[in-house]
Regions:
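Phosphate-binding loop of NTP-binding sites
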Residues: 19-23, 43, 57-60, 69, ...
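Generic beta-sheet signal
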Residues: 30, 52, 91, 135, ...
């Protein structure tokens, strides 16, 4: 079968392209911006890429077109597909129909930690000999790709609540039919497609409804939004994580780089790993609980996490210059910002200076729905720098004024980088947070710090 994918360079759609190729299909695709690293990964798999959406790419006609959720009516290829009656479907539907239908699916859903937790679950299964398939929103550090078919019945998927396509406004995860479901947490997000928290809870309950009776749902006992969702009706086994739940994690070090796994009042494993932060400890415990459902002994799962490498952009060290360390993180919601800063504070200690540099880039952020929570979420930083995005209905200056620590802002990435470089001193830790590229600010900071060091020597 010849399959053409519209919007192929996104992580999810690129992952589907790799799976389709592994199944023996001829695969082509197009995107508005054909860019690495995804373009490089796809070309290595023998997938031809086309820049832009000129309708001529559909001649000769493919057997099937998979349409990404960024595609809208008016797109030349979308219009040609509809006009010529070319068979089409969304990515999540294709994934179910051609890959997941006969697999034991372990799905990881929630507002935060999906990529990390899915990567952990995948690595546990891999390290314990299960050879799972997976589709994950970032490339897990222990693997070279974001998706593969695997060699067993088990398949791990990052289960996103975003919509499927212009013709299917349900959340992607309703197509995945998991037998093991992790619900990490639930907060209001994706304000561009959801009106309120109840609208998201409704979609999460659709997901809960399709887990089999002998399937298992694992979730934190202290998450009120998930409790409300589960109270709408659950027909599957449940395991709770937390102080009053079945599972607990107990820190052995302040930065959570070592911790114990407890199940029903008994210690069943111990994790010593390269990650830090209570949020990662929580993610790891969820992954261990999910792996147990498919047959992995918790002690073995805990040992496997000792060699886990996180996906890029999760408190990732980008470099050091002039005694200043620069980190990058994907955090783009107040809860994630708070957790990431707490993790870094635990890592570097209470006296080291942390400089937080934030780009409010997600749709929810741009709409201003989180702005009142931003200043409190930045509380563990010693100094704050904010980028003012263009054309948004609020000013980051309001957040800067609400911060208890010194806070600064600029509408220009270069100017912001210069401000940070001037402020930074040897021994400081700069944490850059954005769900985008932030105008290449990481390298600008490292270059600026190196120049500053050179000038000081002269």
């Amino acid at each position: 079968m010849r399959i053409h994918i519209l919007g192929i360079c996104g992580t999810f759609m690129g992952g589907l392209a790799m799976l389709a190729r592994s199944l023996g299909h001829e695969v082509t695709g197009s995107d508005a911006n054909v860019y690495p690293p995804m373009s490089t990964l796809l070309e290595k798999q023998g997938i031809d890429l086309i820049q832009g959406y000129d309708a001529s790419q559909l001649d000769p006609q493919p057997d099937l077109v998979i349409i990404g959720n960024a595609m809208t009516r008016g797109n030349p290829c979308v219009e040609a597909v509809l006009e010529k009656n070319i068979p089409y479907m969304s990515g999540p539907q294709w994934l179910h129909d051609f890959v997941l239908r006969d697999r034991w699916v372990l799905a990881v859903a929630g507002t935060h930690g999906k990529t990390t937790t899915a990567g952990m679950a995948t690595w546990i299964l891999e390290a314990c000999g299960y050879k799972p398939g997976f589709v994950i929103g970032g490339v897990p550090g222990n693997f070279e790709v974001s998706a593969r078919l695997g060699e067993s019945d088990f398949f791990v998927i990052e289960a996103d609540e975003y919509d499927c396509a212009f013709f299917d406004k349900r959340s992607k995860f309703v197509h995945y039919c998991p037998r093991t479901l992790i619900l990490n947490n639930l907060e209001f997000d994706h304000a561009d497609i959801f009106d309120d928290l109840k609208a998201i809870q409704k979609q999460f309950h659709h997901l809960v409804r399709i887990v089999p009776g002998q399937g298992r749902i694992i979730y934190p006992e202290n998450d009120i939004n998930l409790k409300q969702t589960m109270a709408m009706g659950c027909w599957s086994e449940q395991e709770l994580v937390g102080e009053q739940g079945h599972w607990q994690a107990k820190k052995l070090t302040t930065d959570a780089s070592e911790w114990e796994v407890w199940l029903d009042g008994e210690k069943v494993g111990e994790v010593k790993w390269g990650l830090v932060g209570e949020h990662n400890m929580h993610n790891g415990l969820m992954a261990i609980a999910a792996a147990r459902h498919v047959g992995v002994v918790p002690a073995d799962a805990a040992n496997a996490l000792g060699s886990f490498i996180n996906a890029r952009r999760r408190l990732e060290l980008r470099g050091e210059a002039n005694g200043v360390t620069v980190y990058d993180d994907f955090a783009h919601h107040p809860t994630a910002i708070l957790a990431t800063l707490a993790a870094l504070r635990g890592k570097v200690g209470g006296t080291a200076r942390i400089i937080a540099v934030l780009e409010p880039r997600s749709n929810t952020m741009k709409m201003g729905l989180c702005k009142d929570d931003l200043a409190p979420s930045l509380g563990r930083a010693d100094e704050v720098f904010l980028l003012q995005p263009p054309h948004i209905p609020w000013q980051v200056a309001e957040v800067a004024e609400a911060c208890v620590q010194p806070a600064h802002w600029s509408g220009d990435v270069d100017a912001l980088a210069d401000m940070v470089v001037k402020t930074a001193q040897s021994g400081d830790h700069i944490l850059v947070m954005s769900n985008g590229g932030f105008g290449g600010i990481h390298q600008k900071l490292l270059d600026g710090l190196a120049k500053k060091a050179q000038a000081e020597e002269e």
